[in-house]
UniProtKB/Swiss-Prot annotation:
Gene3D superfamilies: Aldolase class I. It comes from Halalkalibacterium halodurans (strain ATCC BAA-125 / DSM 18197 / FERM 7344 / JCM 9153 / C-125) (Bacillus halodurans). The lineage of its organism: Bacteria, Bacillati, Bacillota, Bacilli, Bacillales. Its EC number is 5.3.1.24. CDD domains: PRAI. Keywords: Amino-acid biosynthesis, Aromatic amino acid biosynthesis, Isomerase, Tryptophan biosynthesis. Belongs to the TrpF family. This is N-(5'-phosphoribosyl)anthranilate isomerase. NCBIfam families: PRK01222.2-1 (NF002301).
């Protein structure tokens, strides 16, 4: 079974245009403080100009006050909320009382990764396992030891939720990840050239992941 694709960190009209014509299942927008941070006004303006061909839209936050998440989601056509910080079970349960959307939780790979997944059993609709980089929450271009991917996938299967793998995935190394059979692949910097989403790199990723070099939306 082919993994789902999520292209995260879209931060310009040109990024959205490149991702919209791709075969991605999800497009991500970062509302946390980072070099890829966007505003909801920017995102809605871009989406007014681009047909994303049915792709689902993910709003990413890091330890954001719940009121602020509610405010953003009310203004934009988002399908998923991704919590990418240290949000715990109580936080996510409170968030879900306020917003009727699926919530994904990032797990930053460490010796406690599986324990963190188990602590969130039953309250999230997917996990995103990312590299842990001191002082940063994601989009670093750093990967983690993929030999442990099967352990995360096994825990996701036990909980009956998909597990996306993120962190440092690019056209040059994605083939090393594929044998582990991830449910989804989450890419940000790996499809960028000079800070912008690259249609050429997107094509390279999709040819390797989906086995098809025709660059059309699936």
């Amino acid at each position: 079974m082919q993994p789902m694709l999520k292209y995260c960190g879209n931060r310009s009209l040109e990024d959205v245009q490149a991702a919209a014509t791709s075969k991605a299942d999800y497009l991500g927008f970062v509302f946390a403080k980072s070099k890829r941070q966007v505003t909801v006004n920017e995102v809605t303006r871009w989406l007014d100009q681009v047909n994303v061909n049915g792709k689902k839209l993910v709003a990413l936050f890091v330890n954001e006050p719940i009121d602020q998440i509610v405010n953003v989601v009310k203004q934009g056509p988002f399908d998923v909320i991704q919590c990418h910080g240290t949000e715990n079970r109580d936080y996510i349960m409170t968030l879900k009382e306020r917003i009727d959307l699926p919530v994904w939780k990032a797990i930053h790979h460490s010796g406690q990764g599986l324990q963190m997944m188990r602590a969130l059993e039953g309250v999230v609709e997917a996990f995103v396992v990312d590299a842990k980089v001191e002082g940063q929450w994601g989009g670093t271009g750093q990967s983690f030891d993929w030999h442990v991917v099967p352990l995360y996938l096994q825990e996701g299967k036990r909980q009956q939720v998909p597990v996306f793998i993120a962190g440092g995935i690019n056209p040059h190394n994605v083939e090393l990840l594929l044998p582990y059979g991830p449910c989804g692949i989450d890419i940000s910097s790996g499809i960028e050239e000079n800070g912008q989403k690259s249609s050429a790199k997107i094509c390279q990723i999709e040819k390797k992941v989906l086995g098809d070099d025709s660059h059309i939306s699936r």
